[in-house]
Amino acid sequence: FVNNFDGVILSYQNSKVAQEMTAQAIFGGIGINGTLPVSTKHFSINTGFNTTKIRLGYGIPEEFGVSEFDLYKIDSLANNAIDKKATPGCQILIAKKGQIIFNKSYGFHTYNNKIKVGTDDVYDLASITKVSASLPLLMKMVDEGKLNIDDSLSAHLDLDTSDKGGLIIRDILAHQSRLKSWIPFYRNTLEDDTINGVKVLRDTLYDTQESVLFPYKVAEGIYLHYSYPDSIFKTIKYSELREEKKYKYSDLGYYIFQRILENTYSDKLNNLIDNNFYDRLGMENMGYLPLERMDVNRIIPTEQDYLYRSQLIQGYVHDQGASMLGGVAGHAGVFSNANDLAKLMQMYLNNGDYAEENYISSETLKEFTKYQFPENNNRRALGFDKRALEGKGGATCTSVSVSSFGHTGFTGTIAWVDPEYELIYIFLSNRIHPDAENLKLIRMNVRTDIMQEVYNYFGGK
């Protein structure tokens, strides 16, 4: 019977711990090196083989000298944020040296307290999409010799009739290319008149049914005209540049990067990231267009949108510009739970390797994750955010190392990687439910205060 298998694992016990460790051994979450202490019918004493850890594993804080009780402050901070209505719920994940040692959910999907947040539920990552979809594909282009970050945009797109062709990709990625911060594209698709104080969608641009003319699903029962994504790109193409070449965070470059990526590889952005990264990394929950992959009750809702879509946004991207591209954009649109996002972050932490596969060269990753223009008081790397320069604001607590990198999202999210401490911190929430004007999560410093607690216990070597 045993000869029918390539390998057999002997776990000795049928306990919960033994089952979990055996599963991790099979999938490479832990390495094994045990041998048989006695002979059996099919195997002699000392038979065994060694395997190595190749994927994120699951451990406990005690492996690093921290008891679960020590982490009560994280629970307190999360629950206090929920009590103060900074967010209805959240997910928090900590990984240390390749082991997920903390992965918990708090609160509910909404303030009606009907559906508890589960660790498999997904959040709208907002701008974390930039570093989890656009950036890995841009780094792939660099590795393949299809992109030089010091190229001008004109090397990749026909922009001859505008002033955008001379913009340098490195400057765009570091947010100092003079592009505007954002453009509210949706406003030009609304009628001037209102009904009961609510703006009305132009019937020449929207329909309630999908068709060849109206293929882009913006939200439930709202489809945008096929020509409008080109109108968005044209608006960016001819938008006015800022006068000074200084740091100014901008989404607009990622609309441009999406077009470059899709032109280069002749495929849609969601297919590119799925085929080249998410599927290969074993992600079951992460990706664009979550309603095509899971039940709506696993998707955390964001805003009750009164300005544009006149509905609760659930299963559709919150960002209006991304929604006008059918939910797939370079700057927003990816949904995930903390566990899947951690796999991508671990790949970054492993210098581009995961599960014995290389995704990005270490040289490219090193270039993309280092400060680019600190002399301009610009803390950004290429796409990634970094620790603040000389304590001047920023997205992190003060304990992160200078080598660390990550990104935040408007919906109330952060994913951060710290190579010096082999540490990953992820916080996901829907702080904009039901109103994007809710700034309590930001003003209460919830993400950074929890991050500081993580570093208090796991920031050592």
Task: Label the predicted regions.
Residues G65-L125, K146-N148, D319, A436-E437:
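Short, conserved catalytic-motif segment at the N-terminal edge
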Residues N103-Y106, W182-N188, Y288-L289, L428, ...:
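Short, solvent-exposed loop/turn and secondary-structure capping segments
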Residues F1-G65:
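C-terminal non-catalytic regions of proteins with extracellular/luminal or membrane-system context
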Residues L36-I45, N50-T52, S67, N350, ...:
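Short, gly/Ser/Thr-rich active-site loops of penicillin-recognizing serine hydrolases
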Residues S404, T411-I424:
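Short, surface-exposed beta-strand/loop micro-motifs that present aromatic residues
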Residues L10, Q91-L93, D171-L173, G287, ...:
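Structural recognition of the beta-strand scaffold that forms the well-ordered cores
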Residues K84-Q91, N113-A174, E240-G253, A329-A332:
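Short active-site loop at a secondary-structure junction
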Residues G166-V402:
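Short, surface-exposed loop or secondary-structure junction motifs
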